[in-house]
């Protein structure tokens, strides 16, 4: 595309303290959220004749961590296509060359709210179990591609008014380190599993702890473990669930183990005490049964020792969830990730920038009428 023609395709609009320079097809931009990764606007796509969400990545080349995360997100969004993972519609940059390249805009399906808003509502068992079922389907699909999220939280899960749910991002790269001792809180970590905050090894069911925290918050309308830092969070976990057994302590790194073993010992509370009947809809025998099933599922997800925690497959077959089971959703074919070493890659910022630029150019080339060619369209799901 020539320089002048490219210039003519874009216009700029001020959104808070940021300038969005977007393709002219995207009109009526309105800010709907912001986070560590960038600012998100709702917009109207005049070509697709539908509302979309546009995310401007925040300083993608500020450092190697930002650049790696931007590259990982683009590669994975391009490959993953599942009804419970947010759909990629378009990617673009207003800059005209690698030398000028500094902004990345990602266009996605627009949803109605994130789970933070839904958590404040009184949900019946049908809605709660359906939301959890969809969460588990999305997580299982990521796991099938070798993607373990590790950072699920209400703010990165979105819903529509018809109760459909989608996961917004792909979590922490496998190489993203975490440190237990005095780690400052840069982002919300209330939903991260004990094995993450204690710097242990982890497997897929690390994400089931996060689902348990989210489900518990749906029931109680409050954050279960709102720690000020990792140490405070660990204390809140053991105060409620009890100090884990010596067998668990043996798995910890020596410095962490010394600290954890020297904490006061807690017996913890029963799940009947933590999640009493009064918190659930229980106005019929059916609802009383459902409350019992919900509590049982919570007790299997909120287990400190990951070796004793439920797996995503077991959760999908749990009586509280399996009423929704559909093989086309829960057993969808795994996405093909071309770069198997995605999380292990290390580059300079300039090398990351070039890799990201190539991805954006490739996606621009593959985009026709706003939908990425070479993968099933998320629009097909919207129109079903």
UniProtKB/Swiss-Prot annotation:
The modification Phosphoserine is found at residue 377. PROSITE patterns: MAPK, PROTEIN_KINASE_DOM, PROTEIN_KINASE_ST. Phosphorylated by TAOK2. Dually phosphorylated on Thr-183 and Tyr-185 by MAP2K7 and MAP2K4, which activates the enzyme. May be phosphorylated at Thr-183 and Tyr-185 by MAP3K1/MEKK1. Phosphorylated form is more concentrated at synapses than none-phosphorylated. ATP binds at residues 32-40, 55. Its cofactor is Mg(2+). It is an enzyme of class 2 (transferase). Disulfide bonds: none annotated. One of its GO terms (molecular function) is protein serine/threonine/tyrosine kinase activity. The modification Phosphotyrosine is found at residue 185. The active site is at 151 (proton acceptor). Inhibited by SERPINB3. Activated by threonine and tyrosine phosphorylation by either of two dual specificity kinases, MAP2K4 and MAP2K7. Inhibited by dual specificity phosphatases, such as DUSP1. The modification S-nitrosocysteine is found at residue 116. It is found in: Cytoplasm; Nucleus; Synapse. Brain (at protein level). Pfam families: Pkinase. A motif (TXY) lies at residues 183-185. Residues 26-321 form the Protein kinase domain. Induction: In T-cells, following T-cell receptor (TCR) activation. Levels peak 48 hours after TCR and CD-28 costimulation. Keywords: ATP-binding, Biological rhythms, Cytoplasm, Kinase, Nucleotide-binding, Nucleus, Phosphoprotein, S-nitrosylation, Serine/threonine-protein kinase, Synapse, Transferase. Transmembrane segments: none annotated. One of its GO terms (biological process) is positive regulation of protein ubiquitination. Binds to at least four scaffolding proteins, MAPK8IP1/JIP-1, MAPK8IP2/JIP-2, MAPK8IP3/JIP-3/JSAP1 and SPAG9/MAPK8IP4/JIP-4. These proteins also bind other components of the JNK signaling pathway. Forms a complex with MAPK8IP1 and ARHGEF28. Interacts with TP53 and WWOX. Interacts with JAMP. Interacts with NFATC4. Interacts with MECOM; regulates JNK signaling. Interacts with PIN1; this interaction mediates MAPK8 conformational changes leading to the binding of MAPK8 to its substrates. Belongs to the protein kinase superfamily. CMGC Ser/Thr protein kinase family. MAP kinase subfamily. Serine/threonine-protein kinase involved in various processes such as cell proliferation, differentiation, migration, transformation and programmed cell death. Extracellular stimuli such as pro-inflammatory cytokines or physical stress stimulate the stress-activated protein kinase/c-Jun N-terminal kinase (SAP/JNK) signaling pathway. In this cascade, two dual specificity kinases MAP2K4/MKK4 and MAP2K7/MKK7 phosphorylate and activate MAPK8/JNK1. The TXY motif contains the threonine and tyrosine residues whose phosphorylation activates the MAP kinases. This is Mitogen-activated protein kinase 8. It comes from Mus musculus. The lineage of its organism: Eukaryota, Metazoa, Chordata, Craniata, Vertebrata.
